[in-house]
């Protein structure tokens, strides 16, 4: 992948501390930034986005859109499984544009929110106001999880005409989805075609080295020094998504902090065992409910 770079953690630089002391570094990032519509997460910037083979192409495309919105890669369509950083890139573009020109009218929301806006405007008789705000008072439209409008014909109709108006005016459109355009079921063919007009790019689950790089960035932000071997164990024991990785890491750090223990292999394995045990209990509980429900109705779980 263009610009991919394998990042490893040097054990010479990282030493396991006997006791955990989290030193939160002063962040230069703002919190939530209110834009024309919606908010931007100030912590999700290109500076905090860790590139790897799985996401470099998407990151480069997003960076270029952030520097020159409406000039290239329009629309920018980022797709991939949940928890891989699509929303982070969406916010990073918005933050870059906002920092460069605060006069830009940025509208950022989920596809579910867009659907609710359409329904609300119909009920209140303010459809024209909605259309005018989206089509003529917007420089950048960012919509997260577009797959949500699947099967919603009225919402798709509004989005189709909004897309056309913004595209014709050279306004930037950025969309995220869990699938590539051609695999979106229940979406009008004419919309799918427009999603493919620009640049569609996938983000994939990070490999082990990439996950370690993400963990190192996380650890540094907390002022922690963690041995390379321990980081690899965390990377291997966590799930495939960045969200799962960060969740597992937070559990490790949290347990170490509460018990006053160092972050080492033993602690990581203990956390892994605890989390797997919880999942196992949840799974057994679901099975029990299914069996009892089936017995009550005189049927089987398979039925």
Language model: regions and residue ranges:
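Conserved AAA+ ATPase "SRH/arginine-finger" region at the nucleotide-binding site
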Residues: 185, 198-210
């Amino acid at each position: 992948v263009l610009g991919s770079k394998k990042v490893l953690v040097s054990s010479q630089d990282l030493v396991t501390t006997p006791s955990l002391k989290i030193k939160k570094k002063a962040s230069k990032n703002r919190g939530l930034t209110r834009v024309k519509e919606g908010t931007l997460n100030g912590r999700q910037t290109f500076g905090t986005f860790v590139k790897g083979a799985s996401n470099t192409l998407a990151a480069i495309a997003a960076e270029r859109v952030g520097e020159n919105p409406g000039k290239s890669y329009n629309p920018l369509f980022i797709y991939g499984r949940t928890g891989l950083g699509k929303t982070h890139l969406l916010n990073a573009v918005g933050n870059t544009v906002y920092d460069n020109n605060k006069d830009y009218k940025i509208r950022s929301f989920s596809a579910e929110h867009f659907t609710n806006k359409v329904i609300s405007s119909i009920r209140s008789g303010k459809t024209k106001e909605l259309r005018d705000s989206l089509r003529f008072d917007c420089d950048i439209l960012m919509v997260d999880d577009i797959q949500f409008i699947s099967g919603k014909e009225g919402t798709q109709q509004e989005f189709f005409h909004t897309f056309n108006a913004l595209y014709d005016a050279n306004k930037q459109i950025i969309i995220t989805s869990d699938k590539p355009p051609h695999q979106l079921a229940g979406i009008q063919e004419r919309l799918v075609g427009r999603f493919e007009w620009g640049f569609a790019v996938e983000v994939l689950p990070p490999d082990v080295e990439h996950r370690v790089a993400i963990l190192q960035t996380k650890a540094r932000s907390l002022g922690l020094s963690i041995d390379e071997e321990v980081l690899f164990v965390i990377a291997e024991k966590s799930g495939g998504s960045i969200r799962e990785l960060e969740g597992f890491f937070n559990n490790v750090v949290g347990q170490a902090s509460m018990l006053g223990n160092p972050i080492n292999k033993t602690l990581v394995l203990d956390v892994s065992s605890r989390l797997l045990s919880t999942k196992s209990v949840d799974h057994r509980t679901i099975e029990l409910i299914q069996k009892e429900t089936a017995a009550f109705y005189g049927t089987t779980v398979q039925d």
